From Swiss-Prot:
Mg(2+) binds at D13, G40. It is an enzyme of class 6 (ligase). It comes from Acidiphilium cryptum (strain JF-5). HAMAP family: Adenylosucc_synth. One of its GO terms (cellular component) is cytoplasm. This is Adenylosuccinate synthetase. Its EC number is 6.3.4.4.
Length: 429
């Protein structure tokens, strides 16, 4: 059976939740392989609306959920999220959710350091969610992280906490922030251990068995390619790799397990927080897109910045992310707009570039090169076949395919799960 990997092709918030939910109903296993509880999905199933940040989306469809070792896990946030969905009738148990025993933990000191650093940056703040994701990844790379498996070994926790506090308390004190005590953290971790450890296992074994048995595996990415720590708009990025290649390291599977890679992109562009956004419309057009698209972050509640579709940016995401097909969402938001613009490149100091350069100063100076395309007066909302779309809307989609050098294989025309036009089944063998 074919596997599918879903990743964002812009700066996140592309509508991955709906597409993941739609595909999860046909998968056997749904796997998170990077990120933490800093990105959210909103899923509507029947009369229930689920807001997930850490749990794999497939759980709401009764599928096995797996959190891989590439995810940084806040145990308090995880248990709170499990509690919320249980109150909604979703029974999350160790039989339905498995977590990599070597996944790093996010502790309260990580969030404290995150907040203290952002405050110290002032006008140069990155715009993190303040949930400790970055500091937790730093500890993983520096070999001082506390991992889920350590919860079973108090003697290991003892010396790991010494190393962790030496580093973090030094930084916190230097930033004028309160420091942490070892005894309190130890008590918290020992209290969490019996609640977290029943979910833990070497998930690479389970995924190897799933692959061997022919199960369909859906790998669920968080954030998006242009927030990738290597390939995104650095330093205004997340702290993990978000491209499809990350599933091998972040889930403990071989690179061939990715299967078909589906990138998700809105029919326009949005971004939360700081960072370059060449096609941003800080005007009435941007406000109109935000109002129509209900552009507020699931996790932060922050209003998203809005602008025209940036084909040069998405083309870059297609190439570095290994994207083989594009799911285009929120096409209906553009209904009734007489003229549309598509970013096709960037102008920097008289030079035109087909891609966004890596340098922060160059990115800040980048001015978009636009191609103008006629809009449409009819409605695309709720369309479930190409025959239901206005001719000009089809032309818009076709032009995007040409510019990003990737076929649009799925179109979403409303938040409703079934308002989807499928041109190519990503699970097809």
């Amino acid at each position: 059976m074919a596997n599918v990997t879903i990743i964002g092709a812009q700066w996140g918030d592309e509508g991955k939740g709906k597409v993941v939910d739609w595909l999860a109903s046909r998968a056997d296993v749904v796997v998170r392989f990077q990120g933490g509880h800093n990105a959210g999905h909103t899923l509507v199933v029947g009369n229930q609306t689920y807001k997930l940040s850490l749990l794999p989306s497939g759980l709401v469809r009764g599928k096995l959920g797996v959190i891989g070792n590439g995810v940084v896990v806040d145990p308090v946030a995880l248990l709170a999220e499990i509690g919320r969905v249980r109150e909604q009738g979703l029974n999350v148990t160790p039989e339905t959710l498995r977590i990599a025993d070597n996944a790093p933990l996010i502790l309260p000191l990580h969030a404290a350091l995150d907040a203290a650093r952002e405050a110290a940056r002032g006008a140069r703040r990155i715009g993190t969610t303040g949930r400790g994701i970055g500091p937790a990844y730093e500890d993983k790379v520096a070999r001082r992280a506390i991992r889920i498996c350590d919860l079973a070994e108090p003697e290991t926790l003892d010396w790991r906490l010494d190393e962790l506090l030496l580093h973090h308390n030094t930084l916190l004190a230097g930033l004028g922030a309160p420091t942490f005590g070892k005894a309190e953290l130890m008590d918290q971790l020992l209290a969490l251990a019996p609640q977290i450890l029943p979910f833990a296992e070497p998930v690479w074994e389970r995924l190897a068995e799933a692959k061997k048995s022919g199960a369909r595996i859906l790998f669920e990415g968080a954030q998006a390619v242009m927030l990738d720590v290597d390939h995104g708009t650095y330093p205004f990025v997340t702290s993990s790799n978000t491209v499809s290649g990350q599933i091998a390291a972040g889930a403990g599977v071989g690179p061939d397990a990715a299967g078909r890679v589906l990138g998700i992109a809105k029919a326009y562009s949005t971004r939360v927080g700081s960072g370059p956004f060449p096609t941003e419309q800080d005007n009435e057009t941007g406000r109109l897109l935000g109002e129509r698209g209900h552009e507020f972050g699931t996790v932060t509640g922050r209003a998203r910045r809005c602008g025209w579709f940036d084909a040069a940016l998405v083309r870059q995401a297609v190439k570095v992310g290994g994207i083989q097909g594009l799911a285009l969402t929120k096409l209906d938001v553009l209904d009734g707009m007489t003229t549309l613009q598509i970013g096709v490149g960037y102008r920097i100091g008289g030079e035109t570039l087909p891609h966004l350069p890596p340098g922060a100063a160059a990115q800040a100076k980048a001015e978009p090169v636009y191609e103008t395309i006629e809009g449409w007066s009819g409605s695309t909302r709720g369309a479930r076949s190409y025959a239901d779309l206005p001719a000009q809307a089809i032309k818009y989609v076709r032009r995007i395919e040409e510019l990003v050098e990737c076929p649009v294989t799925l179109l979403s025309t409303s938040p409703e799960r079934d308002d989807t036009i499928l041109m190519q089944d990503p699970f097809a063998d």
